[in-house]
A protein has these predicted regions:
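Residues lining hydrophobic/aromatic ligand-binding pockets adjacent to catalytic sites
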Residues: 1-206
Length: 206
């Protein structure tokens, strides 16, 4: 293993593979719940591979009207039909994947629990992803703003998976629609789980 790096990340509900690759490769990850929420980022967005290419999925939150609010306190907006839209998109994109039937009910169960705020949903979602991976990574979740010398501070650096440091990309694996598209790196953890199942962690380790 390379020397352990220190990485600071915002709360992200359905993380890109780069986050889990960094953990699987032995690095230390700090999740900051007190940093001010930033719209249209990996905090509440994730990417899947659909029949038309990469598709962005958004977990709706209650608008803040210019206020600066800690990410952990942001409210999830269940008045918007995002759960139904995500169910439809995941079914359409991954129904033919090898492990869809095994993981899909757990993913939708997480969404349908309807945790009120971002912090609670993040904690439960991260517990689910690590549980499905059968993985106990080195991480810390903080409700206070994190100020430390880090090798990578992703809070202001990363808005989309394409911007994730290349150091933490997983190795290639067989994706749905591989007959139409080249391999799409750093999609959400769902893409890897649906396609690789129990082998997902070994893919992340590279």
């Amino acid at each position: 293993m390379n020397d352990q790096l220190v990485i600071v990340s915002p709360f992200t509900l359905v993380p890109p593979l780069g986050l889990f690759a960094s953990l699987a490769q032995g690095h230390k990850l700090y999740f900051d719940g007190a940093e001010h929420y930033v719209k249209q980022t990996i905090r509440n967005r994730y990417h899947i591979l659909s029949a038309n290419g990469m598709q962005t999925m958004t977990i709706n939150v209650v608008g803040q009207k210019g206020e600066k609010i800690p990410t952990k306190n942001i409210l999830i907006d269940y008045d918007e039909p995002w759960i139904r839209l995500h169910k439809r998109a995941l079914e359409s994109s991954y129904r033919s994947s090898p492990f869809f039937d095994h993981y899909y009910p757990k993913v939708i169960g997480l969404f349908e629990t309807k945790h009120a705020n971002f912090g609670d949903l993040f904690r439960e979602s991260f517990k689910l992803w690590t549980g499905l991976l059968k993985f106990e990574p080195d991480y810390l979740i903080s409700d206070d703003y994190i100020e430390l010398d880090s090798d990578y501070d992703l809070r202001s650096r990363i808005k989309s998976p394409e911007q994730f440091p290349a150091d933490f990309h997983s190795k290639k694996y067989l994706q749905v629609f591989s007959d139409r598209f080249d391999f799409q790196p750093n999609l959400s953890i769902l893409d890897l789980l649906f396609n690789e199942g129990p082998a997902a962690l070994s893919v992340l380790k590279g």
